[in-house]
Amino acid sequence: MSHNTVIPTTDISPKPDPARPRKAQRDAAQEFINSIQGVTFPNSRRIYLQGSRDDIQVPMREIQLSPTLIGGTKEEPQYEENEAIPVYDTSGAYGDPDAKLDVHVGLTQLRQPWIDERQDTEPVAALSSDFTQQRLTDAGLDHLRFNHRPHPLKARKDKRVTQLHYARQGIITPEMEFIALRENMGRERIRGDVLRQQHPGQSFGAQLPENITPEFVRQEVAAGRAIIPANINHPESEPMIIGRNFLVKVNANIGNSSVTSSIEEEVEKLIWSTRWGADTVMDLSTGRYIHETREWILRNSPVPIGTVPIYQALEKVNGGAENLTWEIFRDTLLEQAEQGVDYFTIHAGVLLRYVPMTAKRLTGIVSRGGSIMAKWCLSHHQENFLYQHFREICEICAAYDVSLSLGDGLRPGSIQDANDEAQFAELHTLGELTKIAWEYDVQVMIEGPGHIPMQMIRRNMTEELEHCHEAPFYTLGPLTTDIAPGYDHFTSGIGAAMIGWFGCAMLCYVTPKEHLGLPNKDDVKQGLITYKIAAHAADLAKGHPGAQIRDNAMSKARFEFRWEDQFNLALDPDTARAYHDETLPQASGKIAHFCSMCGPKFCSMKISQEVRDYAAGMEQMSEAFRAHGSELYHSVEDVSHEQSA
């Protein structure tokens, strides 16, 4: 990677082209990340909500709106100002035009002072992973290496450094205060009654306070109902929370494979993901240079990063699942924990006795991690070594504050297999493992399916809450039908909105490439926009305080034909503007009181405004009628007297 480090207001990098040679694709990504600067969306500005201490500044995006025409004349129109709309922002420094960015140096270590002042960590005397030490001494990797790698920390002897530990001790950390400000979304800035109106929700038992306080955050984490993924070796991340009593979150998957992609392309996808609303990102790399790719991603990520460590462990044994050992896996956990991975997906619930339950399935075991562990169990006719060594896994996680995402290795891969014996047997085991992890103050969330028809979705949520003790649920979709390859972001978005409403805390996006290939950056955007819609729809249905503000602002702008405001309030302003301009590209189209769907004579909103004006005129006439005593006829003298007055 060459030096000098920009995300333009709109994407200027060449569109992915399957026919373009691999080197050209990589060069395009390199050009993109090496010309990066902080920008925000059209007519938006970066604001910071100030906490109780100088170094708690929570980034938000504020959408500036144009005023509403309320009367006057053509020469002297009268306007009423519209309030700016604050929205949750995951883009970190990449959304701040004043930020100094260089991917070769990495992001500012926001959380480092908070970690240091707790005085419960220390630098590792020597890197704990043999594999890491080998990589760092390999001169052949120098051209790929991130050169500003920090020295890793771990917990001091007999100390716990997890956010769950602090919460249980009654300690409100700066991370918790940061999150409380962030979850409230600056809605206290909104004064207008029209914008603040909201329908009551159906929360299915979720507790949604009108104002989220740092103490509420602490209580939810202490109870295990929420997690704060925040490895002490990823101080660049901005604190966020995953739990059903908070905003529904969205995860994006990136990662290279043995077939395609490069470090440059994955860093580009990371930045792209945070721009379009990824609350967390999972690096699912399975090809060469996994270690080096992950270092670049972590040092440049403002959001928590998750991984599936078994993927890299499998690479270390050249793809032979039967050759995996606990020692290799343990070394991989230490390697990733000291790099700064915030949460691990661990398939510890795939037990030997559950594997035969999948024999009668239509699609068998579709989870990569699940199939790897099933093959290992059958090859050795032994119990899953992740299950056998789970307490040791927890000890490692507790030393670095790595959260556990207990993987659903037996999730259904087709709607025919939904809600079967194998799926729920594993889920119940994940509940047992959750209690063990909590013994070590390790934060836990539970992964869920998968392919589930709509009428069977809610049972997944109720089973998880009951058997996994209300630990946060994190699902892939679920996909509600199997007939739409190329459109599985739609089929899964339906299920995601439903299960988010029922209480799922985080939704793992699905891209149009699901079941077809490795997603490029355009697919990442499509998947994220789809899932931001699903998450927001779930927040509205649950009745999350303030969730409807942006919808109300959009509806008001739509009724008043403020086209630019409509574009800017959209989740994807560029696409909204482009679709409008396909048929009305002229500047006059941005002030017209109609669009190309209905035209000027059939616009329902224009007609509705005319009806309102007519009704207002009728009301004035009615008032005048009542003022005259409700008499139909008046003497000429009375009328003449009024006219002269």
Swiss-Prot record:
Q: Which domain of life is it from?
A: Bacteria
The record ties this protein, via InterPro entries, to: ThiC (IPR037509), ThiC-associated_dom (IPR025747), ThiC/Bza_core_dom (IPR038521), ThiC/BzaA/B (IPR002817)
Name the GO cellular-component terms: cytosol
State its cofactor. Answer: [4Fe-4S] cluster
Q: Keywords in UniProt for this one?
A: 4Fe-4S, Iron, Iron-sulfur, Lyase, Metal-binding, S-adenosyl-L-methionine, Thiamine biosynthesis, Zinc
Record carries keyword Lipoprotein? no
Name the residues that bind [4Fe-4S] cluster: C595, C598, C603
Please tell me where substrate binds in this chain.
Answer: N253, M282, Y311, H347, S367, R368, G369, D408, G409, L410, R411, E447, Y474
The EC class name is lyase
Q: Where does Zn(2+) bind?
A: H451, H515
Q: One GO BP annotation here? A: thiamine biosynthetic process
Stated name of the protein = Phosphomethylpyrimidine synthase
State the species of origin: Photorhabdus laumondii subsp. laumondii (strain DSM 15139 / CIP 105565 / TT01) (Photorhabdus luminescens subsp. laumondii)
